[in-house]
Design a protein with these regions (language model features):
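Fe(II)/2-oxoglutarate oxygenase catalytic core
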Residues: 1-156, 162-188
């Protein structure tokens, strides 16, 4: 690996971000679960958020193609890991009313025997003026990006799924993000 993360600042315009928020908000709500020991469970001490799944369908084809190309570019220049696909994006809402957050974690479930999450993606959909707190942060990382850049609306962050990260509690307003995991053969 050449680096621990990379980002594409303001890749999506504010109008594109608002369109994603509007369309994704119409999708059914799912439980925000976490992976522990090969199982999924709800744990509000670890994670408080509302999620909706965006499936890889013709309605969302342009978004998937766009993010797929960014991940391929990031992988080629920064990570060089073996990955194969991403089935769905997670549209996530963190709200002040329940102090939306996600404590330090990594996205790979090493207990799964066949496929591992290899590259993670986080897209900042909200205007940073619309909320306080809710910072996406890398932890246990040698070098971290400037928080101003990771809060910029439309920015796409790509990183290996074994990298620890968190979202601090939202203290005012609401933060929306799009999250994706590109899977592939087991980490070695």
């Amino acid at each position: 690996m050449v680096s621990e993360w990379c980002y594409f600042k303001q890749h999506f315009s504010p109008e594109q971000c608002q369109d994603i928020i509007r369309r994704a908000s119409l999708l059914p709500v799912s439980d925000a679960s976490i992976g522990k020991g090969g199982e999924f469970a709800k744990d509000e001490d670890t994670r408080r958020s509302i999620i909706r799944w965006i499936r890889r369908t013709s309605e969302w084809a342009d978004l998937f193609t766009d993010v797929d190309l960014l991940v391929a570019k990031a992988n080629s220049t920064h990570f060089q890991v073996a990955y194969q696909y991403c089935n769905a994006f997670q549209f996530t809402e963190y709200d002040e009313s329940y102090q939306g957050h996600y404590i330090e974690h990594m996205d790979t479930f090493l207990a799964f025997p066949n496929v591992h999450r290899k590259l993670s993606v986080s897209v900042q959909l909200s205007d940073p003026a619309d909320y306080s707190g809710g910072d996406f942060e890398f932890t246990k990382c040698g070098q971290v990006p400037n928080p101003i850049n990771t809060r910029t609306q439309g920015t796409v962050i790509v990183f290996p799924s074994i990298t620890y990260h968190k979202v601090t509690p939202v203290t005012k307003g609401k933060r929306y993000s799009l999250v994706a995991w590109y899977e592939g053969p087991q980490w070695r």
